[in-house]
Amino acid sequence: MRGTKLPPTLFAEGVDKTPWKRFTGDDKRKGYGFVYVFAECSKHGIPMGNVKIGYTNSVTKRYKDVQHYNGNRIKVYGHWRGEEDTMKMFESTAHSIARDFHKHGEWFHFSNTSAIIDTVEDINKHYEV
């Protein structure tokens, strides 16, 4: 499917929306990447607790891949763009912030939606353009 766009990103109250402003797809320039937060949701869009925090060069392709192999809906809770090396380090920072919820690999488990949103806000505080 060419031209697939990400669904709108959910924002917690007070989260700086500037990095996401008018984001509709990937940055095609070489040397750039994304850190993302995807949440597994019920068919009604309610987060089920499982959250994937990772790095990719193509956030739209990664979203489609995760959605394809996952039987539940996937919602984007956050994505940050930057230079590849910086974003790879930022992914480690994001994993450290969420370490108390670590399940395995890049997957984390949260007990409620507000814990997901709080973690996204904490990750956002460490994002430097």
Predicted regions and their residues:
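Non-catalytic accessory segments flanking enzymatic or RNA/DNA-binding domains
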Residues: 1-129
